[in-house]
Design a protein with these regions (language model features):
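Short, low-complexity, polar/charged sequence segments that are solvent-exposed and flexible
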Residues: 57-60, 89-91, 122-128, 155, ...
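Short alpha-helical "patches" and their helix-cap loops
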Residues: 70-76, 148-155, 256-260
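Conserved ATP-binding subdomain of kinase catalytic cores across diverse folds
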Residues: 2-118, 138-145, 161-162, 168-172, ...
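Conserved kinase catalytic-core helix
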Residues: 115-154, 208
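Aromatic-acidic/polar surface patches that form glycan- and anion
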Residues: 50, 127-131, 231
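Glycine-rich loops and low-complexity Gly/Arg-rich segments
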Residues: 53-54, 63-66, 93-98, 129-133, ...
Length: 272
């Protein structure tokens, strides 16, 4: 395994930038490290557990070597909330101030042009297009109940774009923390990214890394989840279920291939 570093990063939010799109009603804030972060708050309309899901999903994915923005745990001071009139969320017909305290942040990618859409003609030329099969395996493992979300950034290595995988809030079925596995979830909307998946080897090295993922690493990642976000016993039960699912990822991928939503049109290999 050649994982990206897992870094426990507790930062302090210093400045408000702007609101972001999406069901969690995130906001972009600057932290005391000088970077901007897309921040989800404890009182987001989806679930408090979404913050833990983001930390777990991002950290596990980065440990697998996938291109995922660096996650952080941010402390949002009450003074920043009070001094930022736009730092609010809409719940039903009410407008509420975002909660202060510990929040989840995903480092904003600010280098070069950043897009949330590329046409099919450009997707196959994305520098790390093979990683779509790796994050697909990750999404099956963690039961991501949302469609795969991606942003594309200008590549520093060559002309073109690199995919950065974002939004793990609906892993473990969002706030439910169960695993309703179906073939309809976790697939990127533009199937051209899977056109070179011809067999199990196309999911390597990420599939083998999942199957051999150390339980000690899972515990270390989970240990950084703030107790304000989830009770310890409940979190530890989730970790045990995540670990138990490692051996089922091939089965879960095969179920998608056998479904009407099969995105792997060129896969001809039969055996696991």
């Amino acid at each position: 395994m050649n994982p990206q570093n897992i870094v426990t990063s507790l930062l302090v939010a210093t400045d408000y930038i702007r609101a972001m799109r999406g069901g969690a009603q995130s906001h972009m804030l600057t932290a005391n490290d000088g970077h901007a972060y897309v921040v989800k708050f404890a009182n987001n309309p989806q679930s408090l557990r979404v913050l833990a899901n983001e930390w777990l999903g991002c950290s596990i994915g980065r440990a697998l070597g996938l291109t995922i923005p660096e996650p952080a745990i941010l402390y949002v001071p009450a003074t920043l909330v009070e001094s930022s009139p736009s730092l609010v969320i809409q719940v039903s017909k009410s407008t509420l101030k975002c909660s202060y305290g510990l929040a989840f942040g995903s480092r904003f990618i600010s280098e070069g042009q950043v897009l949330d859409y590329l046409p099919d003609s450009a997707l196959s030329q994305v520098e790390n297009v093979r990683e779509f099969s790796g994050v697909f395996a990750l999404d099956r493992w963690l039961c991501n109940c949302d469609g795969r979300q991606v942003v594309f950034c200008e590549s520093e290595r060559r002309r073109g774009f690199r995919a950065h995988f974002i939004d793990f809030g609906f892993c473990f079925n969002a706030g439910e923390w169960n695993f309703p596995d179906t073939a309809l979830r976790g697939i990127y909307a533009h199937k051209v990214v899977y056109q070179n998946v011809g067999g199990w080897q196309s999911f390597e090295p990420w599939l083998s890394r999942i199957e051999s993922f150390p339980l000690t690493t899972l515990w270390a990642i989970a240990g950084d989840v703030p107790p304000e976000w989830v009770e310890r016993d409940t979190l530890f039960q989730l970790v045990e279920r995540i670990d138990a699912r490692r051996s089922r990822v091939r089965e879960l991928i095969a179920a998608v291939r056998q479904s009407q939503r099969n995105p792997f049109g060129t896969w001809t290999e039969d055996k696991p």
